[in-house]
């Protein structure tokens, strides 16, 4: 849980410490060792993931024949991180305690994030690096928006409870940091909004909707506080020419649907669209239809994409789905899309429970942000995402949804 917390709080700042990969390797050994005591999840969703893991192993072998082993293995983690979903079987006897630990990680996420963000603005503290050349407090604001949504959804669903006035303080910090994140990331902003809309639309809980109405009373105060913060708190522009502010948030939102006067926003959108179009062309209409380009090569170099290197080496097209298409080809791409559709179509199930809805909406936030950024290709996004997927698989396979296990989780939440 400590390692998971570090990836949630710090993200890319510890990505090159390879803690997640080491944990995955150790967990896999333990899973093999305890295999006789564990029931294999054989739901259709799980079987699709097993298939992707097997295919990925073959692609890794194929890639090492032509490219360096380390580059191939690194690219192969796009699906290797799926293993985290099944490592949760090691905690099957204490799954409720495991879930409670995740709630606790997010209970004070907004507060800790706010402190870390303020510290990152200090020249000395903000420049500290422990792993590679990435600053320890290097924030990817799309990732932050996803975690803020999780913190928010845990609060309004009652999974995390707060004494007054901490409930209001937490809401203020969530939306304050969401405003900051929205200044830098359009994808993250939309991930939060879209996932919340889906949650509200499909929630059948009268209690949750009543709690939301109570929180809406504070909305004007929260908005005023956020606007004042954005208006008075001045931060230098980032490498994309974006700075914290109300105008920047507005420009980011309008640039999604229209062409703005901000050249950086337009350029950032154009190079993505051009790259995505090239991938679709050489797979669906080109020589990489069946097998893709494989693992081990840099897609940016091979596709002749010219961008700045201010975020480090660029290997993937800022879209998880199209990364799969480019590297694995059309067949694996459609298998992946089929898995995603299976996850989402459960929203229409009449037996949809509160926890099931929450876990699906969390997956929506992750997947949407991953459609505009390099997120699930690395441990900072993939580790927590596949943990949530694993919880979903376990609760569905063992029949814990709408059962005493789910009821106990909601009853055991404390202030």
For each feature predicted by the language model, list its residue ranges.
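N-terminal signal-anchor transmembrane segment
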Residues: 1-36, 54-66, 78, 116-119
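Hydrophobic transmembrane alpha-helices and their immediate junctions
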Residues: 305-308, 327-366, 401
């Amino acid at each position: 849980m400590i390692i998971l917390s570090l990836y949630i709080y710090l993200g890319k700042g510890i990505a090159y410490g390879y803690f997640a990969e080491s944990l995955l390797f150790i967990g896999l050994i333990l899973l093999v060792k305890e295999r006789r005591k564990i029931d294999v999840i054989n739901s259709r969703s799980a079987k699709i993931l097993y298939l992707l893991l097997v295919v990925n192993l073959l692609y890794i072998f194929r890639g090492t024949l032509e490219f360096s082993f380390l580059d191939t293995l690194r690219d192969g983690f796009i699906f290797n991180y799926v293993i985290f979903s099944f490592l949760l079987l090691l905690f099957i006897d204490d799954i409720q305690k495991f879930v409670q630990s995740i709630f606790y990680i997010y209970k004070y996420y907004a507060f800790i994030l706010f402190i870390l963000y303020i510290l990152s603005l200090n020249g000395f503290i903000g420049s500290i690096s422990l792993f590679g050349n990435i600053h320890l407090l290097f924030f990817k604001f799309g990732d932050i928006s996803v975690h803020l949504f999780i913190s928010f959804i845990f609060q309004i669903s009652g999974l995390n409870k707060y004494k007054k006035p901490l409930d209001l303080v937490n809401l203020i910090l969530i939306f304050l940091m969401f405003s900051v994140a929205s200044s830098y990331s359009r994808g993250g902003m939309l991930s939060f909004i879209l996932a919340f809309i889906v949650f509200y639309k499909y929630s059948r809980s009268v209690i949750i909707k009543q709690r939301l109405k109570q929180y809406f009373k504070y909305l004007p105060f929260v908005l005023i506080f956020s606007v004042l913060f954005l208006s008075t708190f001045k931060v230098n522009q980032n490498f994309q020419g974006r700075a914290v502010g109300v105008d920047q948030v507005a420009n980011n939102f309008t640039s999604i649907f229209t062409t703005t006067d901000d050249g950086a926003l337009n350029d950032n959108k154009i190079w993505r669209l051009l790259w995505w179009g090239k991938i679709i062309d050489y797979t669906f209409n080109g020589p990489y239809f069946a097998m893709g380009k494989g693992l081990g090569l840099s897609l940016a170099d091979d596709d002749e994409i010219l961008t700045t290197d201010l975020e480090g080496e660029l290997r993937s097209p800022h879209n998880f789905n199209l990364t799969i298409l480019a590297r694995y080809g059309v067949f694996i791409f459609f298998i992946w899309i089929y898995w995603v559709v299976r996850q989402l179509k459960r929203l229409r199930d009449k037996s949809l429970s509160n926890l099931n809805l929450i876990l699906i909406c969390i997956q929506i936030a992750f997947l949407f942000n991953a459609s505009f950024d390099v997120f699930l290709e690395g441990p900072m996004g993939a580790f927590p995402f596949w943990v949530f997927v694993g919880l979903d698989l376990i609760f569905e396979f063992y029949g814990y949804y709408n059962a005493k296990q789910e009821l106990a989780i909601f009853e055991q939440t404390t202030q």
